[in-house]
Amino acid sequence: MLRVDDLSVRYGKKLVIDHVSAGFKPGRIYGLVAPNGCGKSTLLRAMAGTGNGRAEGAVSVDAGDCMGIEARRRVFYAPGEGTLLYPGLTAADHLKMARGLWASDVDLARVAAECRVDGFGRKRVRSFSQGMKQQLTLAVAYATGARYLLLDEPMNALDPTNVAVQGELIRKAAAEGGCVVLSSHILGNVDELCDTVLFLKDGKLLRYSGEPRSAGELYRKLFG
């Protein structure tokens, strides 16, 4: 399990994440929902140990400290908008680098084919459309073999075909014993994919546990 206990994150004097505690179990898909600027990316980065705010509290991976290299390799944070990628490297370069840094044994040809990046594996990122960058970012996440995938707006810039493809790959990752935490503004995808939906409001995580409702309905109730 990936756990956060009493986690707070500040940027200067601004408290963005306010004493959050939660557990994320393998085999499940979690949705993280909030308006822009409410701290979704900040929380995901803090969970992966890659944030640049001032963090307090604890993050643990499978009951161990998250600071060791082996624990860190079990978690991967994939930011949106292609910011993970290097313009001068090819798609194939990125996949090889991810597998090497995370010491995984993932079949890169399979990942490239599943994520539909095999057709532009030798092209450099600087020539990619935004949708191609997003496809590659997600392929990089799978190439790491990390158990816990933290995906920040993973469906942004994808066309409907690739949204469906990534939905199936996210389900597959969970079915094979992984855990996926995804932030999204596409609330229909949240309803379709996620076992649990968490809302971030005023720095606090809220988990809905009443009768089944759509993420959109709950969003309107919480945020207007």
Language-model segments: residues:
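Catalytic Walker B motif of ABC-type/P-loop ATPase nucleotide-binding domains
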Residues: 149-153
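Conserved ABC transporter NBD signature motif
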Residues: 49, 53-71, 207
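Conserved ABC ATPase "signature" region
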Residues: 96, 105-121
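Conserved structural motif at the start of ABC-family nucleotide-binding domains
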Residues: 2, 17-18
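H-loop/switch region of ABC-family ATPase nucleotide-binding domains
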Residues: 183-185
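The feature captures the beta-strand-to-loop junction immediately N-terminal to the Walker
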Residues: 33-35
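Q-loop/switch helix immediately C-terminal to the Walker
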Residues: 87-101
